[in-house]
Amino acid sequence: MSAGGGRAFAWQVFPPMPTCRVYGTVAHQDGHLLVLGGCGRAGLPLDTAETLDMASHTWLALAPLPTARAGAAAVVLGKQVLVVGGVDEVQSPVAAVEAFLMDEGRWERRATLPQAAMGVATVERDGMVYALGGMGPDTAPQAQVRVYEPRRDCWLSLPSMPTPCYGASTFLHGNKIYVLGGRQGKLPVTAFEAFDLEARTWTRHPSLPSRRAFAGCAMAEGSVFSLGGLQQPGPHNFYSRPHFVNTVEMFDLEHGSWTKLPRSLRMRDKRADFVVGSLGGHIVAIGGLGNQPCPLGSVESFSLARRRWEALPAMPTARCSCSSLQAGPRLFVIGGVAQGPSQAVEALCLRDGV
């Protein structure tokens, strides 16, 4: 797109969700945005399921989830949405896997995960669902990799990740699944690893240069970006506290190395717990938490062509801890926390896509 900066983007505001929530699970299927589970005002996981018809801009209530949960993963398989893992009302990870049949408007239980887990990362490839890592009921990070075969309704084990973690960022590129970051307890993970789907082997890549919690990650044009977050103090710096940063680190998949961009190419705002995505040749960073007493509403983009950060139109509703989903020219920002769990549903769009 030839327009620069904010001229290339606009916000599209959708009707608010009937149910306010944070840590909801989201999916997009055939013109419908599904929002499943999450935590409501009481702080407990929900079984509520709702869908937004993108054409009519109307919300419909769906049959409730058989298992109330928050922080689950979701994968679209044709006319089905598979919901995997998460945490239940007693804050315990669950093994439940359930599928919503779009054409029939009902849920079906599927083969459970071999181990209960929250913070599972999922990737779909050729109709198979890969579930990586997670945190079990004992709070230990998991290294397990499982693949779900829908025709047989079963999970099979694959070679474990070299580094156990939960809440990692995953990217499918070629025949490889890239796994970046995540956490082990309260500690952020710097590992960057790739699973070859054909050879079924793991490769360790150089670790992230800096240790940051609640960073944002994206992949675009053969590079992986790690942005912002809470910088963790070094092992010998006992008096330092975590602090918000605007760090930008970039991994070149072809050359196999990280570059920490100079101060002049850092984000404009220091932020953590924000939404990040790739739209029209830009890496975009949306909302989150910073040094201010309330969530950020600022939005910025890094132009891959011009190699600079530019301010974009601010969020209509400033929030952090949002669910997000990219569908075509739209990056949806759903729910999250404003002054409490939010009902807001907004999408940052390329102007040609509004």
Curated annotation (Swiss-Prot):
GO terms for biological process: mitotic cytokinetic process; mitotic nuclear division; nuclear chromosome segregation. It is found in: Cytoplasm; Midbody. The keyword Cytoplasm applies. Keywords: Cell cycle, Cell division, Chromosomal rearrangement, Cytoplasm, Kelch repeat, Repeat. The keyword Cell division applies. One of its GO terms (cellular component) is cytosol. Kelch repeats lie at residues 1-31, 32-79, 81-127, 128-175, 176-222, 224-281, 282-329, 331-354. Its main location: cytoplasm. SMART domains: Kelch. Involved in pinching off the separated nuclei at the cleavage furrow and in cytokinesis. Required for mitotic integrity and maintenance of chromosomal stability. Protects cells against mitotic errors, centrosomal amplification, micronucleus formation and aneuploidy. Plays a key role of midbody function involving abscission of the daughter cells during cytokinesis and appropriate chromosomal and nuclear segregation into the daughter cells. It is linked to Lymphoma, Hodgkin, classic: A malignant disease characterized by progressive enlargement of the lymph nodes, spleen and general lymphoid tissue, and the presence of large, usually multinucleate, cells (Reed-Sternberg cells). Reed-Sternberg cells compose only 1-2% of the total tumor cell mass. The remainder is composed of a variety of reactive, mixed inflammatory cells consisting of lymphocytes, plasma cells, neutrophils, eosinophils and histiocytes. This is Kelch domain-containing protein 8B. The gene is KLHDC8B.
